[in-house]
């Protein structure tokens, strides 16, 4: 059976944390900031953790991510 490969697009978007979780960056950050409040823009700069519902699916795509 062939080796399972890492999904390269996902590998660029997620990072593994020291405790084994997955860190991701937020959506809605590429343009159209004039419609967002200063508080929204400030919170969009921060990374967040992958939700528990998505964790199993993303972990399967990132088989060899360190």
Swiss-Prot record:
GO terms for biological process: translation. GO terms for cellular component: cytosolic large ribosomal subunit. Gene3D superfamilies: 4.10.410.60. PROSITE patterns: RIBOSOMAL_L35. Pfam families: Ribosomal_L35p. InterPro entries: Ribosomal_bL35 (IPR001706), Ribosomal_bL35-like (IPR021137), Ribosomal_bL35_CS (IPR018265), Ribosomal_bL35_sf (IPR037229). Residues 1-16 have a biased composition (Basic residues). GO terms for molecular function: structural constituent of ribosome. Keywords: Ribonucleoprotein, Ribosomal protein. Residues 1-21 are annotated as: Disordered. It comes from the Bacteria. Signal peptide: none annotated. HAMAP family: Ribosomal_bL35 (MF_00514). Belongs to the bacterial ribosomal protein bL35 family. This is Large ribosomal subunit protein bL35. The lineage of its organism: Bacteria, Bacillati, Bacillota, Bacilli, Lactobacillales. The gene is rpmI.
